[in-house]
Amino acid sequence: MVSPIEVRLQMTYPEFTVSTDLALPGAGITALFGPSGSGKTTCLRCIAGLEKAEQGFIRVHDEVWQDSENGVFLAPHKRAIGYVFQEASLFDHLSVRANLEFGLKRIPRPQRRIELQQATELLGIDHLLERRPDKLSGGERQRVGIARALLTSPRLMLLDEPLAALDTKRKGEILPYLERLHRELDIPMLYVSHAQDEVARLADHLVLLEAGKVLASGPIRETLARLDLPLAMGDDAGVVIEGTVSAYDRHYQLLTVTLPGSNLCMRVAHAELQIGTLLRVKVQARDVSLNLQSDDHSSILNRLPVTVLEEALADNLAHVLVKLNAGGTPLLARITRYSSDQLNLHRGQTLWAQIKAVAVLA
């Protein structure tokens, strides 16, 4: 079992105090999510050693990087991290190849976990090696920056809003490469963002920060479904589901996706995928309606038997949020208070969730 990443920080600023006590997974992608000024980047910089917490303890894979009580503070260059900033800081007078080799040459050959060819293939930049950075698009520059960070053979990748400076099209170009790194490399990543769509697509674990404090930390599918958190109140409230492709209807071009841990399925309009492929989807609370019985005379494809777990007022007092259990998979529904009363909703009640739309994330 991979050792967790421990981060305990105490830092005082004029505007707010950062206070964290986190045990994060030592594998996969952990997202630090929250509004601007919530302390996301400060936490990342402390983990990197670019800032020193007044009181701090940081341990990564059983190696202590900071222990203020015992006077331990490992310099940034000794922490085996790959740091990706909002904008790639490349040497414009060097080619892409030379930029990548600059980082690679610092790592003794026996300690290299990733070679140049592997990094360029993973990020799709083989054809850019002889170009200068000023001839690259913003998305290409960022992919080169990520490749350069990988070539330092890090034990931990730190990504500080790496897509924030890019437009929607460029973001869409880079996200598949980040997903590929997630699938193919055994390197944990801490990913800072305030964009919920990025987090929903990439993260396995979610840390929600506000004003320097940790509001929640847990697996993304559980954390997004919590009604006591601000995420459930917004218009983008919804859950992430990672199901398994179990069938494909070529005539109607519909995937059948089996929900984890159950026999329940959803059908999703999508190109054909190999049976057994894991598929991540998002179901928005606003796209889920409730019925006391299954309506077979409806255009809605996905109707699932569910049990009511809890209910809470939404930010708009005309609505309520309902947390549901669909065979072990959490769902959220946003309905009017009037509808809740008409259905006589209560904990433990069984009914049908009608899902009007399913968004494929990855």
Swiss-Prot record:
Highest taxon of the lineage: Bacteria
Compartments where found: Cell inner membrane
Residue ranges constituting the ABC transporter domain according to the UniProt record: 2-236
Enzyme Commission no: 7.3.2.5
Keyword Amino-acid biosynthesis: no
Name of the top EC class for this enzyme: translocase
Pfam families: ABC_tran, TOBE
InterPro entries, sorted: AAA+_ATPase, ABC_transporter-like_ATP-bd, ABC_transporter-like_CS, Mo/tungstate-bd_C_term_dom, ModC_ABC_ATP-bd, Molybdenum_import_ModC, Mop_domain, P-loop_NTPase
Keywords from the UniProt entry: ATP-binding, Cell inner membrane, Cell membrane, Membrane, Molybdenum, Nucleotide-binding, Translocase, Transport
Catalytic activity: molybdate(out) + ATP + H2O = molybdate(in) + ADP + phosphate + H(+)
Annotated membrane topology: Peripheral membrane protein
Domain Mop: 297-362
Gene3D superfamilies noted in UniProt: 2.40.50.100, P-loop containing nucleotide triphosphate hydrolases
A GO CC annotation given for this chain: plasma membrane
Residue numbers binding ATP: G34, P35, S36, G37, S38, G39, K40, T41
GO molecular function: ABC-type molybdate transporter activity; ATP binding; ATP hydrolysis activity
NCBIfam families documented for this protein: modC_ABC (TIGR02142)
Functional description taken from the UniProt entry: Part of the ABC transporter complex ModABC involved in molybdenum import. Responsible for energy coupling to the transport system.
PANTHER family for the chain: ABC TRANSPORTER I FAMILY MEMBER 10, MOLYBDENUM IMPORT ATP-BINDING PROTEIN MODC 2
Oligomer status and interactors: The complex is composed of two ATP-binding proteins (ModC), two transmembrane proteins (ModB) and a solute-binding protein (ModA).
Protein name: Molybdenum import ATP-binding protein ModC
Organism: Pseudomonas syringae pv. tomato (strain ATCC BAA-871 / DC3000)
